Amino acid sequence: RRVLFRSQAVINEAHSRGLVVPDRVRGKEGETQAAGAYVAYPKKGLHEWIGSMDLNSLYPSVIRALNMSPETIVGQIRQDRTKDMIRNGMASGMSFAECWEGKFACLEYDIVMNQDIGEDIIIDWENGKSQQVSGKEAYDIIFLNGQSLMLSANGTIFTYETKGVIPGLLERWYAERKDLQKKAKTAGDSKEFEFWDKRQLVKKINLNSAYGALLNAGSRSEEHTSELQSRGLISYAV
């Protein structure tokens, strides 16, 4: 039921914008498994000045920050180097997760963010065109040409000219939760506090479970969001 609720919420959000939601195309089981999140390995030993932080609604915040939604994808950097790295690692006996040890993003993302002039990458645009450029040129195209583009750690390029359906839905839920939290704080008695507190908790669960629900095989959006997840920052978190 939770999966159906979140899937229907996305559909309703799209319809409210006058958008048509594609029919679901059923694939074979196991074709679209989601990768696990990025986990940094601890550095053993005694350390000074240790700190920690807890990002507010991490996955929803990442989706909103990069405007991640299937309809906002405008390009994808080919992951040739990254695929070779994984293929070679697994051939040597490493697991898929072990191939990613110590890495936050795909190798091509690092080339772009380091503005490497000696390494070329290929960008496949949604309009069917492909473009071979250096890391520096790709950085300029994405961040410096005023094209309202964002780049995820897996090399997916999103536009933020218009707000995506999924980020827009999460933004509304987030605002609604904040409003419910305010009502809980100003409640006149414990019964009223409990009423509003439970409602804000429901919103919190909706926000934090949306990522997994949209990737669930029972979700109508699964075949679209699994592609998004496999290419997006939320695979490895921030």
Please state what every model-predicted region is.
Residues 227-238:
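Short "domain-exit" segments at the C-terminal end of structured domains
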Residues 1-226:
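Conserved acidic
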